[in-house]
UniProtKB/Swiss-Prot annotation:
Top-rank lineage group of the source organism: Eukaryota
Subcellular location: Cytoplasm
Induction summary: By sucrose.
Gene3D superfamilies linked: P-loop containing nucleotide triphosphate hydrolases (3.40.50.300)
SUPFAM superfamilies the record matches: P-loop containing nucleoside triphosphate hydrolases
Residues binding ATP, per UniProt: 55-62
Domain ABC transporter residues, every copy: 14-257
Region (Disordered): 263-295
Protein's name in the database: ABC transporter I family member 20
Amino acid sequence: MAVTEEEKKRNSTVEISGLRFTYPGIDGHPPPGSKPLIEDFSITLNSSDRCLLVGSNGAGKTTILKILGGKHMVEPHMVRVLGRSAFHDTGLTSSGDLCYLGGEWRRDVAFAGFEVPIQMDISAEKMIFGVAGIDPQRRDELIKVLDIDISWRLHKVSDGQRRRVQICMGLLKPFKVLLLDEITVDLDVLARADLLKFLRKECEERGATIIYATHIFDGLEDWPTHIVYVANGKLQLALPMEKVKETSKKSLMRTVESWLRKERDEERKRRKERKANGLPEFETRTEESRVTGDPARMLNNGWAAGRLHSTVAGGEDNFVLSSNRVLR
């Protein structure tokens, strides 16, 4: 019997509905009239889904993952992870149910309550075994999967070896939703293949959901269950992989390449037309201006500059009043 849309919504682990997002200026407010970076973006993913997020540089992939990871403020109804608001419900990340690996995480990791540069003189063993409350069996499995020598001194090993230690630490807690932002770039062929195999098993055996943004397609031909293509902050397509394979006879890499080439050709055509009409080839961005009050809330997703904690209890129900409207 076919699953209804209502049943899919009930069972969804990740739900983005009409997402709109604008980065603020230096004063914490997006410039008036600035174009949203993400606009009218909607996807739904369920348990066991492995979603590949693709797009050109600057398309908005990292921003989408950060919003899903609770790093940026948006209206509570726009982004739901495990049925909860990704930003307001800090229990999602503190419990390990929602895990984000990417961006600043690649340069520093939290160790013993402090931000520690991963290049410092410390052993892999101290970093990995310093994470409390971890299942020893899972820890041993990850050390084996990533082929880590726990005697490594992190200031002496290669970038790829340091990355393995970081990934191991990030995956120690069993997650329900995992967000990956190009974290395999330094891994060798074997380390990457073994990691992808482990992540696939996490989805198939534990029902985890993974969203993986990458430009490296080696070994991914049969890995994802879904693919999402974003361009200029807008959703271009979101399809199960079998649908993509039905419509394209090319490999995954060649299929994505054809999408990106078409996008680039159209962008070059637009720039040429702007130039022919006496306009700047590239659109200028508005910066360092300020808008306040209710219009600001509509533009800046409720950001408040300089606040690091909430002064009003109650989570998303107090969205309008809460001062917990900041960049995390």
